[in-house]
Amino acid sequence: MSTRTVSSSSYRRMFGGPGTASRPSSSRSYVTTSTRTYSLGSALRPSTSRSLYTSSPGGVYATRSSAVRLRSSVPGVRLLQDAVDFSLADAINTEFKNTRTNEKVELQELNDRFANYIDKVRFLEQQNKILLAELEQLKGQGKSRLGDLYEEEMRELRRQVDQLTNDKARVEVERDNLAEDIMRLREKLQEETLQREEAESTLQSFRQDVDNASLARLDLERKVESLQEEIAFLKKLHDEEIQELQAQIQEQHVQIDMDVSKPDLTAALRDVRQQYESVAAKNLQEAEEWYKSKFADLSEAANRNNDALRQAKQESNEYRRQVQSLTCEVDALKGTNESLERQMREMEENFAVEAANYQDTIGRLQDEIQNMKEEMARHLREYQDLLNVKMALDIEIATYRKLLEGEESRISLPLPNFSSLNLRETNLESLPLVDTHSKRTLLIKTVETRDGQVINETSQHHDDLE
Protein backbone atom coordinates (compact mmCIF):
# COMPACT_ATOMS: atom_id res chain seq x y z
CA MET A 1 0.00 0.00 0.00
CA SER A 2 1.22 3.46 -0.76
CA THR A 3 -0.08 6.72 0.63
CA ARG A 4 0.05 10.14 -1.02
CA THR A 5 -0.90 13.25 0.92
CA VAL A 6 -1.43 16.52 -0.95
CA SER A 7 -2.01 19.66 1.14
CA SER A 8 -1.69 23.32 0.24
CA SER A 9 -2.40 26.66 1.83
CA SER A 10 -3.82 29.66 0.01
CA TYR A 11 -2.15 31.87 2.58
CA ARG A 12 1.27 31.11 1.09
CA ARG A 13 -0.06 31.83 -2.36
CA MET A 14 -1.41 35.17 -1.17
CA PHE A 15 1.13 36.35 1.39
CA GLY A 16 4.21 34.20 0.81
CA GLY A 17 4.64 33.58 4.54
CA PRO A 18 2.95 33.83 7.91
CA GLY A 19 3.57 37.53 8.34
CA THR A 20 3.70 39.11 4.93
CA ALA A 21 1.02 40.54 2.61
CA SER A 22 1.16 41.20 -1.09
CA ARG A 23 0.11 44.41 -2.85
CA PRO A 24 -3.15 44.59 -4.84
CA SER A 25 -2.92 44.12 -8.56
CA SER A 26 -5.33 44.64 -11.44
CA SER A 27 -5.39 41.05 -12.75
CA ARG A 28 -7.43 38.05 -11.68
CA SER A 29 -6.79 34.39 -12.36
CA TYR A 30 -9.38 31.68 -12.15
CA VAL A 31 -7.87 28.19 -11.73
CA THR A 32 -10.17 25.21 -11.80
CA THR A 33 -8.91 21.71 -11.13
CA SER A 34 -11.00 18.65 -11.66
CA THR A 35 -9.71 15.36 -10.34
CA ARG A 36 -10.89 11.89 -11.16
CA THR A 37 -9.39 8.84 -9.47
CA TYR A 38 -9.78 5.26 -10.57
CA SER A 39 -8.36 2.53 -8.27
CA LEU A 40 -8.64 -1.18 -7.73
CA GLY A 41 -8.72 -2.97 -4.45
CA SER A 42 -11.39 -4.12 -2.11
CA ALA A 43 -9.93 -2.21 0.84
CA LEU A 44 -9.26 1.02 -1.14
CA ARG A 45 -11.00 4.12 0.20
CA PRO A 46 -12.52 6.49 -2.29
CA SER A 47 -10.59 9.68 -2.81
CA THR A 48 -12.08 12.92 -1.58
CA SER A 49 -11.75 16.19 -3.48
CA ARG A 50 -12.11 19.63 -1.94
CA SER A 51 -12.10 22.91 -3.81
CA LEU A 52 -10.82 26.00 -2.10
CA TYR A 53 -11.94 29.37 -3.46
CA THR A 54 -9.74 32.02 -2.04
CA SER A 55 -9.36 35.68 -2.78
CA SER A 56 -6.10 37.43 -2.23
CA PRO A 57 -5.52 41.19 -2.20
CA GLY A 58 -4.14 40.86 -5.70
CA GLY A 59 -7.39 39.45 -7.00
CA VAL A 60 -6.13 35.88 -7.65
CA TYR A 61 -8.76 33.17 -7.43
CA ALA A 62 -7.34 29.64 -7.19
CA THR A 63 -8.88 26.21 -6.90
CA ARG A 64 -6.86 23.39 -5.49
CA SER A 65 -7.62 19.77 -4.97
CA SER A 66 -6.50 18.25 -1.74
CA ALA A 67 -7.01 14.56 -1.62
CA VAL A 68 -5.86 11.91 0.72
CA ARG A 69 -6.07 8.63 -1.02
CA LEU A 70 -5.07 5.16 0.03
CA ARG A 71 -4.22 2.81 -2.75
CA SER A 72 -2.98 -0.72 -2.73
CA SER A 73 0.45 -1.44 -4.12
CA VAL A 74 -0.81 -4.61 -5.77
CA PRO A 75 -3.56 -4.91 -8.35
CA GLY A 76 -5.56 -7.28 -6.19
CA VAL A 77 -5.68 -8.99 -2.79
CA ARG A 78 -5.59 -12.71 -2.47
CA LEU A 79 -7.83 -13.80 0.38
CA LEU A 80 -9.23 -17.05 1.48
CA GLN A 81 -12.93 -17.48 1.70
CA ASP A 82 -13.04 -18.20 5.43
CA ALA A 83 -9.81 -16.45 6.57
CA VAL A 84 -8.76 -12.81 6.95
CA ASP A 85 -5.32 -11.42 6.16
CA PHE A 86 -4.67 -9.47 9.41
CA SER A 87 -1.24 -8.35 8.25
CA LEU A 88 -2.95 -6.30 5.55
CA ALA A 89 -5.32 -4.84 8.15
CA ASP A 90 -2.39 -4.01 10.46
CA ALA A 91 -0.56 -2.32 7.62
CA ILE A 92 -3.67 -0.32 6.77
CA ASN A 93 -4.21 0.61 10.43
CA THR A 94 -0.56 1.64 10.84
CA GLU A 95 -0.69 3.73 7.70
CA PHE A 96 -3.98 5.27 8.80
CA LYS A 97 -2.51 6.10 12.22
CA ASN A 98 0.47 7.76 10.60
CA THR A 99 -1.86 9.72 8.36
CA ARG A 100 -3.95 10.77 11.36
CA THR A 101 -0.82 11.79 13.23
CA ASN A 102 0.34 13.91 10.30
CA GLU A 103 -3.12 15.40 10.00
CA LYS A 104 -3.14 16.26 13.71
CA VAL A 105 0.24 17.98 13.37
CA GLU A 106 -0.98 19.85 10.32
CA LEU A 107 -4.21 20.82 12.10
CA GLN A 108 -2.17 22.05 15.06
CA GLU A 109 -0.10 24.20 12.74
CA LEU A 110 -3.26 25.41 11.06
CA ASN A 111 -4.75 26.24 14.45
CA ASP A 112 -1.63 28.22 15.36
CA ARG A 113 -1.77 30.05 12.06
CA PHE A 114 -5.47 30.61 12.53
CA ALA A 115 -4.83 32.13 15.97
CA ASN A 116 -2.13 34.34 14.45
CA TYR A 117 -4.55 35.34 11.70
CA ILE A 118 -7.21 36.23 14.25
CA ASP A 119 -4.74 38.36 16.21
CA LYS A 120 -3.61 40.04 13.03
CA VAL A 121 -7.21 40.61 11.94
CA ARG A 122 -8.02 42.18 15.31
CA PHE A 123 -4.94 44.38 15.08
CA LEU A 124 -5.84 45.41 11.52
CA GLU A 125 -9.44 46.11 12.59
CA GLN A 126 -8.14 48.33 15.38
CA GLN A 127 -5.85 50.12 12.93
CA ASN A 128 -8.76 50.40 10.52
CA LYS A 129 -10.93 51.96 13.24
CA ILE A 130 -8.13 54.38 14.13
CA LEU A 131 -7.69 55.35 10.48
CA LEU A 132 -11.45 55.74 10.06
CA ALA A 133 -11.57 57.98 13.13
CA GLU A 134 -8.66 60.04 11.78
CA LEU A 135 -10.37 60.22 8.38
CA GLU A 136 -13.66 61.37 9.93
CA GLN A 137 -11.75 63.87 12.03
CA LEU A 138 -9.92 65.20 8.97
CA LYS A 139 -13.19 65.37 7.04
CA GLY A 140 -14.82 67.21 9.93
CA GLN A 141 -11.88 69.59 10.25
CA GLY A 142 -11.87 70.21 6.50
CA LYS A 143 -15.61 70.89 6.49
CA SER A 144 -15.71 72.96 9.68
CA ARG A 145 -12.51 74.96 9.44
CA LEU A 146 -10.81 74.96 6.06
CA GLY A 147 -13.96 74.96 3.95
CA ASP A 148 -15.61 77.80 5.89
CA LEU A 149 -12.41 79.85 6.02
CA TYR A 150 -11.80 79.28 2.33
CA GLU A 151 -15.37 80.19 1.36
CA GLU A 152 -15.39 83.24 3.64
CA GLU A 153 -12.05 84.46 2.34
CA MET A 154 -13.13 83.81 -1.26
CA ARG A 155 -16.33 85.81 -0.69
CA GLU A 156 -14.32 88.65 0.87
CA LEU A 157 -11.86 88.59 -2.02
CA ARG A 158 -14.68 88.56 -4.58
CA ARG A 159 -16.36 91.47 -2.77
CA GLN A 160 -13.11 93.45 -2.75
CA VAL A 161 -12.48 92.63 -6.40
CA ASP A 162 -16.02 93.78 -7.30
CA GLN A 163 -15.57 96.96 -5.27
CA LEU A 164 -12.22 97.68 -6.90
CA THR A 165 -13.72 96.97 -10.31
CA ASN A 166 -16.56 99.40 -9.62
CA ASP A 167 -14.12 102.03 -8.33
CA LYS A 168 -11.95 101.54 -11.37
CA ALA A 169 -14.95 101.86 -13.70
CA ARG A 170 -16.11 104.99 -11.86
CA VAL A 171 -12.62 106.52 -12.03
CA GLU A 172 -12.40 105.64 -15.72
CA VAL A 173 -15.77 107.33 -16.34
CA GLU A 174 -14.61 110.41 -14.43
CA ARG A 175 -11.36 110.35 -16.37
CA ASP A 176 -13.27 110.14 -19.66
CA ASN A 177 -15.53 113.00 -18.59
CA LEU A 178 -12.53 115.09 -17.56
CA ALA A 179 -10.82 114.24 -20.83
CA GLU A 180 -13.92 115.39 -22.71
CA ASP A 181 -14.03 118.59 -20.64
CA ILE A 182 -10.34 119.17 -21.31
CA MET A 183 -10.84 118.61 -25.03
CA ARG A 184 -13.80 121.00 -25.03
CA LEU A 185 -11.81 123.59 -23.08
CA ARG A 186 -8.87 123.13 -25.42
CA GLU A 187 -11.14 123.72 -28.40
CA LYS A 188 -12.60 126.77 -26.67
CA LEU A 189 -9.07 127.93 -25.84
CA GLN A 190 -8.08 127.54 -29.47
CA GLU A 191 -11.15 129.50 -30.54
CA GLU A 192 -10.41 132.21 -27.98
CA THR A 193 -6.79 132.24 -29.10
CA LEU A 194 -7.90 132.72 -32.70
CA GLN A 195 -10.29 135.47 -31.64
CA ARG A 196 -7.52 137.09 -29.60
CA GLU A 197 -5.18 136.92 -32.58
CA GLU A 198 -7.90 138.45 -34.76
CA ALA A 199 -8.50 141.14 -32.14
CA GLU A 200 -4.77 141.79 -31.90
CA SER A 201 -4.55 142.04 -35.69
CA THR A 202 -7.59 144.37 -35.68
CA LEU A 203 -6.04 146.33 -32.83
CA GLN A 204 -2.82 146.52 -34.76
CA SER A 205 -4.70 147.87 -37.77
CA PHE A 206 -6.55 150.28 -35.49
CA ARG A 207 -3.25 151.34 -34.01
CA GLN A 208 -1.96 152.00 -37.50
CA ASP A 209 -5.13 153.98 -38.23
CA VAL A 210 -4.68 155.86 -34.95
CA ASP A 211 -1.08 156.53 -35.82
CA ASN A 212 -2.13 157.68 -39.26
CA ALA A 213 -4.87 159.82 -37.72
CA SER A 214 -2.40 161.23 -35.21
CA LEU A 215 0.00 162.02 -38.00
CA ALA A 216 -2.82 163.56 -40.01
CA ARG A 217 -3.93 165.56 -36.97
CA LEU A 218 -0.39 166.76 -36.37
CA ASP A 219 -0.12 167.66 -40.02
CA LEU A 220 -3.43 169.49 -39.86
CA GLU A 221 -2.37 171.21 -36.65
CA ARG A 222 0.81 172.31 -38.34
CA LYS A 223 -1.22 173.45 -41.32
CA VAL A 224 -3.61 175.28 -38.97
CA GLU A 225 -0.68 176.89 -37.24
CA SER A 226 0.84 177.87 -40.57
CA LEU A 227 -2.52 179.20 -41.73
CA GLN A 228 -2.94 181.09 -38.48
CA GLU A 229 0.53 182.48 -38.87
CA GLU A 230 -0.27 183.29 -42.48
CA ILE A 231 -3.56 184.91 -41.40
CA ALA A 232 -1.75 186.85 -38.72
CA PHE A 233 0.90 187.84 -41.23
CA LEU A 234 -1.75 188.81 -43.78
CA LYS A 235 -3.67 190.67 -41.10
CA LYS A 236 -0.53 192.42 -40.04
CA LEU A 237 0.31 193.13 -43.62
CA HIS A 238 -3.23 194.30 -44.18
CA ASP A 239 -3.03 196.54 -41.17
CA GLU A 240 0.25 197.92 -42.38
CA GLU A 241 -1.22 198.47 -45.81
CA ILE A 242 -4.22 200.11 -44.23
CA GLN A 243 -1.98 202.28 -42.16
CA GLU A 244 0.05 203.13 -45.23
CA LEU A 245 -3.13 203.81 -47.12
CA GLN A 246 -4.45 205.91 -44.28
CA ALA A 247 -1.17 207.73 -44.17
CA GLN A 248 -1.34 208.18 -47.90
CA ILE A 249 -4.95 209.25 -47.57
CA GLN A 250 -4.07 211.73 -44.92
CA GLU A 251 -1.26 213.02 -47.05
CA GLN A 252 -3.56 213.16 -50.00
CA HIS A 253 -6.20 214.81 -47.82
CA VAL A 254 -3.69 217.36 -46.80
CA GLN A 255 -2.77 217.83 -50.37
CA ILE A 256 -6.41 218.03 -51.29
CA ASP A 257 -6.96 220.55 -48.65
CA MET A 258 -4.02 222.39 -49.95
CA ASP A 259 -4.94 221.89 -53.45
CA VAL A 260 -8.59 222.14 -53.95
CA SER A 261 -8.23 221.96 -57.56
CA LYS A 262 -6.91 218.40 -57.43
CA PRO A 263 -9.38 215.55 -58.02
CA ASP A 264 -11.23 213.97 -55.01
CA LEU A 265 -9.16 210.94 -54.07
CA THR A 266 -10.86 210.29 -50.77
CA ALA A 267 -13.78 208.61 -52.31
CA ALA A 268 -11.52 206.52 -54.47
CA LEU A 269 -9.40 205.48 -51.54
CA ARG A 270 -12.49 204.77 -49.54
CA ASP A 271 -13.79 202.61 -52.27
CA VAL A 272 -10.46 200.84 -52.59
CA ARG A 273 -10.30 200.39 -48.84
CA GLN A 274 -13.83 199.02 -48.76
CA GLN A 275 -12.96 196.69 -51.57
CA TYR A 276 -9.82 195.48 -49.76
CA GLU A 277 -11.67 195.21 -46.48
CA SER A 278 -14.43 193.23 -48.10
CA VAL A 279 -11.91 190.98 -49.83
CA ALA A 280 -9.90 190.56 -46.60
CA ALA A 281 -13.03 189.86 -44.59
CA LYS A 282 -14.18 187.40 -47.18
CA ASN A 283 -10.79 185.68 -47.23
CA LEU A 284 -10.65 185.67 -43.44
CA GLN A 285 -14.16 184.23 -43.23
CA GLU A 286 -13.36 181.58 -45.82
CA ALA A 287 -10.13 180.70 -44.02
CA GLU A 288 -11.92 180.50 -40.69
CA GLU A 289 -14.69 178.36 -42.19
CA TRP A 290 -12.17 176.07 -43.90
CA TYR A 291 -10.17 175.83 -40.69
CA LYS A 292 -13.28 175.11 -38.66
CA SER A 293 -14.48 172.49 -41.13
CA LYS A 294 -11.07 170.83 -41.25
CA PHE A 295 -10.76 170.99 -37.47
CA ALA A 296 -14.25 169.54 -37.08
CA ASP A 297 -13.44 166.75 -39.54
CA LEU A 298 -10.16 166.02 -37.80
CA SER A 299 -11.83 166.17 -34.39
CA GLU A 300 -14.57 163.83 -35.57
CA ALA A 301 -12.02 161.44 -37.08
CA ALA A 302 -9.96 161.63 -33.88
CA ASN A 303 -13.08 161.00 -31.79
CA ARG A 304 -13.99 158.04 -33.99
CA ASN A 305 -10.47 156.70 -33.74
CA ASN A 306 -10.47 157.29 -29.99
CA ASP A 307 -13.78 155.45 -29.67
CA ALA A 308 -12.48 152.58 -31.80
CA LEU A 309 -9.24 152.55 -29.83
CA ARG A 310 -11.15 152.62 -26.54
CA GLN A 311 -13.40 149.81 -27.74
CA ALA A 312 -10.39 147.83 -28.98
CA LYS A 313 -8.68 148.38 -25.64
CA GLN A 314 -11.79 147.24 -23.80
CA GLU A 315 -12.10 144.17 -26.03
CA SER A 316 -8.40 143.47 -25.60
CA ASN A 317 -8.71 143.76 -21.83
CA GLU A 318 -11.80 141.54 -21.90
CA TYR A 319 -10.00 138.99 -24.06
CA ARG A 320 -7.00 139.17 -21.78
CA ARG A 321 -9.18 138.54 -18.74
CA GLN A 322 -10.90 135.64 -20.51
CA VAL A 323 -7.54 134.19 -21.55
CA GLN A 324 -6.26 134.50 -17.98
CA SER A 325 -9.40 132.88 -16.57
CA LEU A 326 -9.25 130.10 -19.16
CA THR A 327 -5.55 129.62 -18.46
CA CYS A 328 -6.31 129.35 -14.75
CA GLU A 329 -9.11 126.87 -15.47
CA VAL A 330 -6.83 124.85 -17.76
CA ASP A 331 -4.10 124.83 -15.10
CA ALA A 332 -6.62 123.76 -12.46
CA LEU A 333 -7.99 121.04 -14.74
CA LYS A 334 -4.44 119.92 -15.54
CA GLY A 335 -3.70 119.68 -11.82
CA THR A 336 -6.95 117.81 -11.22
CA ASN A 337 -6.22 115.49 -14.15
CA GLU A 338 -2.69 114.84 -12.90
CA SER A 339 -3.96 114.16 -9.37
CA LEU A 340 -6.66 111.83 -10.73
CA GLU A 341 -4.14 110.05 -12.94
CA ARG A 342 -1.78 109.73 -9.98
CA GLN A 343 -4.62 108.38 -7.82
CA MET A 344 -5.61 106.02 -10.61
CA ARG A 345 -2.01 104.76 -10.95
CA GLU A 346 -1.80 104.32 -7.18
CA MET A 347 -5.13 102.49 -7.17
CA GLU A 348 -3.98 100.28 -10.05
CA GLU A 349 -0.71 99.53 -8.24
CA ASN A 350 -2.56 98.80 -5.00
CA PHE A 351 -5.07 96.68 -6.91
CA ALA A 352 -2.25 94.77 -8.61
CA VAL A 353 -0.48 94.20 -5.27
CA GLU A 354 -3.71 93.11 -3.57
CA ALA A 355 -4.61 90.90 -6.54
CA ALA A 356 -1.14 89.30 -6.37
CA ASN A 357 -1.57 88.77 -2.62
CA TYR A 358 -5.02 87.30 -3.18
CA GLN A 359 -3.66 85.04 -5.93
CA ASP A 360 -0.88 83.89 -3.57
CA THR A 361 -3.45 83.25 -0.84
CA ILE A 362 -5.69 81.36 -3.28
CA GLY A 363 -2.71 79.35 -4.53
CA ARG A 364 -1.67 78.55 -0.96
CA LEU A 365 -5.21 77.51 -0.07
CA GLN A 366 -5.46 75.42 -3.23
CA ASP A 367 -2.13 73.77 -2.36
CA GLU A 368 -3.41 73.04 1.14
CA ILE A 369 -6.65 71.65 -0.32
CA GLN A 370 -4.65 69.55 -2.79
CA ASN A 371 -2.44 68.27 0.04
CA MET A 372 -5.52 67.44 2.09
CA LYS A 373 -7.07 65.67 -0.90
CA GLU A 374 -3.86 63.71 -1.47
CA GLU A 375 -3.70 62.81 2.22
CA MET A 376 -7.35 61.75 2.17
CA ALA A 377 -6.72 59.74 -1.00
CA ARG A 378 -3.71 58.12 0.67
CA HIS A 379 -5.82 57.26 3.72
CA LEU A 380 -8.54 55.92 1.45
CA ARG A 381 -6.01 53.79 -0.42
CA GLU A 382 -4.63 52.48 2.88
CA TYR A 383 -8.18 51.86 4.04
CA GLN A 384 -8.94 50.03 0.78
CA ASP A 385 -5.77 47.97 1.15
CA LEU A 386 -6.76 47.09 4.71
CA LEU A 387 -10.25 46.19 3.53
CA ASN A 388 -8.76 43.97 0.84
CA VAL A 389 -6.49 42.32 3.41
CA LYS A 390 -9.44 41.91 5.77
CA MET A 391 -11.55 40.35 3.01
CA ALA A 392 -8.69 38.01 2.13
CA LEU A 393 -8.29 37.05 5.77
CA ASP A 394 -12.05 36.55 6.13
CA ILE A 395 -12.04 34.29 3.08
CA GLU A 396 -8.97 32.47 4.43
CA ILE A 397 -10.68 32.02 7.79
CA ALA A 398 -13.82 30.73 6.08
CA THR A 399 -11.68 28.37 4.04
CA TYR A 400 -9.91 27.04 7.12
CA ARG A 401 -13.26 26.73 8.87
CA LYS A 402 -14.53 24.60 5.99
CA LEU A 403 -11.33 22.56 6.11
CA LEU A 404 -11.70 22.06 9.84
CA GLU A 405 -15.36 21.14 9.50
CA GLY A 406 -14.51 18.71 6.69
CA GLU A 407 -11.71 17.15 8.72
CA GLU A 408 -13.95 16.91 11.76
CA SER A 409 -16.69 15.25 9.70
CA ARG A 410 -14.14 12.88 8.17
CA ILE A 411 -12.66 12.03 11.57
CA SER A 412 -16.12 11.35 12.97
CA LEU A 413 -16.73 8.61 10.28
CA PRO A 414 -16.52 4.98 11.70
CA LEU A 415 -13.63 2.76 10.63
CA PRO A 416 -14.44 -0.34 8.58
CA ASN A 417 -14.46 -3.71 10.46
CA PHE A 418 -12.27 -6.03 8.53
CA SER A 419 -13.34 -9.04 10.62
CA SER A 420 -16.92 -8.74 9.44
CA LEU A 421 -16.00 -8.54 5.80
CA ASN A 422 -17.22 -11.42 3.67
CA LEU A 423 -14.25 -12.02 1.46
CA ARG A 424 -13.94 -14.68 -1.10
CA GLU A 425 -10.93 -16.21 -2.70
CA THR A 426 -9.86 -14.55 -5.84
CA ASN A 427 -7.29 -15.65 -8.23
CA LEU A 428 -5.04 -12.79 -9.05
CA GLU A 429 -3.92 -14.37 -12.25
CA SER A 430 -7.50 -14.56 -13.47
CA LEU A 431 -8.06 -10.82 -13.00
CA PRO A 432 -7.20 -8.61 -15.90
CA LEU A 433 -4.66 -5.93 -15.37
CA VAL A 434 -6.27 -2.53 -15.39
CA ASP A 435 -4.09 0.46 -15.78
CA THR A 436 -5.32 3.05 -13.35
CA HIS A 437 -4.75 6.67 -14.24
CA SER A 438 -5.86 9.90 -12.69
CA LYS A 439 -6.56 12.64 -15.17
CA ARG A 440 -6.49 16.21 -13.93
CA THR A 441 -7.61 19.11 -16.10
CA LEU A 442 -6.23 22.55 -15.10
CA LEU A 443 -8.02 25.65 -16.43
CA ILE A 444 -6.18 28.94 -15.92
CA LYS A 445 -8.20 32.04 -16.78
CA THR A 446 -6.52 35.45 -16.50
CA VAL A 447 -8.58 38.64 -16.58
CA GLU A 448 -6.92 42.07 -16.51
CA THR A 449 -9.05 45.02 -15.44
CA ARG A 450 -8.42 48.73 -15.25
CA ASP A 451 -10.79 51.21 -13.61
CA GLY A 452 -13.51 48.54 -13.44
CA GLN A 453 -13.29 47.66 -17.17
CA VAL A 454 -11.97 44.39 -18.63
CA ILE A 455 -9.05 45.11 -20.94
CA ASN A 456 -7.66 41.58 -21.48
CA GLU A 457 -8.89 38.01 -20.90
CA THR A 458 -6.92 34.81 -21.58
CA SER A 459 -7.64 31.11 -20.89
CA GLN A 460 -5.23 28.13 -20.76
CA HIS A 461 -5.99 24.40 -20.43
CA HIS A 462 -3.51 21.88 -19.01
CA ASP A 463 -4.13 18.13 -18.83
CA ASP A 464 -2.05 16.12 -16.34
CA LEU A 465 -2.03 12.32 -16.05
CA GLU A 466 -1.13 10.58 -12.75
Swiss-Prot record:
Annotated positions of the N6-succinyllysine modification: K120, K129, K188, K294, K445
Record region (Disordered): 1-31
GO aspect biological process, one term: positive regulation of epithelial cell migration
Biased amino acid composition, Low complexity: 1-13, 20-31
GO molecular function, one term: structural constituent of cytoskeleton
GO CC entries: axon; cytoplasm; intermediate filament; nuclear matrix; plasma membrane
Positions where Phosphothreonine occurs in the chain: T20, T426, T436, T446, T458
Region described as Linker 1: spans on this chain: 132-153
Sections of the chain in a coiled coil: 96-131, 154-245, 303-407
Family membership: Belongs to the intermediate filament family.
Subunit and interaction comment: Homomer assembled from elementary dimers. Identified in complexes that contain VIM, EZR, AHNAK, BFSP1, BFSP2, ANK2, PLEC, PRX and spectrin. Interacts with BCAS3. Interacts with LGSN. Interacts with SYNM. Interacts (via rod region) with PLEC (via CH 1 domain). Interacts with STK33. Interacts with LARP6. Interacts with RAB8B. Interacts with TOR1A; the interaction associates TOR1A with the cytoskeleton. Interacts with TOR1AIP1. Interacts with TOR1AIP1. Interacts with DIAPH1. Interacts with EPPK1; interaction is dependent of higher-order structure of intermediate filament.
Protein name: Vimentin
Organism: Sus scrofa (Pig)
Gene that this polypeptide is encoded by: VIM
